[in-house]
Structures are given as C-alpha cells and as structure tokens.
C-alpha cells in the first residue's frame, strides 16, 4: 500500500465486485 487513495479505490471496487458476484 503506497497511497491510501489506491487502497480506498481497491477496497471500494472489491466491495462492489463481491456484491455483484453474490447478486448474480
């Protein structure tokens, strides 16, 4: 983790992706 922004973006994308994966 170099920048907290990247961590936030990755975390948000992971959360959304996981939610979508469970939705389907």
Curated annotation (Swiss-Prot):
Keywords: NAD, Oxidoreductase, Tricarboxylic acid cycle. Disulfide bonds: none annotated. It is an enzyme of class 1 (oxidoreductase). It comes from the Bacteria. Its EC number is 1.1.1.37. One of its GO terms (biological process) is tricarboxylic acid cycle. Coiled coil: none annotated. The keyword Ligase does not apply. NAD(+) binds at residues 11-17. It catalyses: (S)-malate + NAD(+) = oxaloacetate + NADH + H(+). SUPFAM superfamilies: NAD(P)-binding Rossmann-fold domains. Catalyzes the reversible oxidation of malate to oxaloacetate. This is Malate dehydrogenase. It comes from Planomonospora venezuelensis. The gene is mdh.
């Amino acid at each position: 983790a170099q920048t907290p922004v990247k961590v936030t973006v990755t975390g948000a994308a992971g959360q959304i992706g996981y939610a979508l994966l469970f939705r389907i």
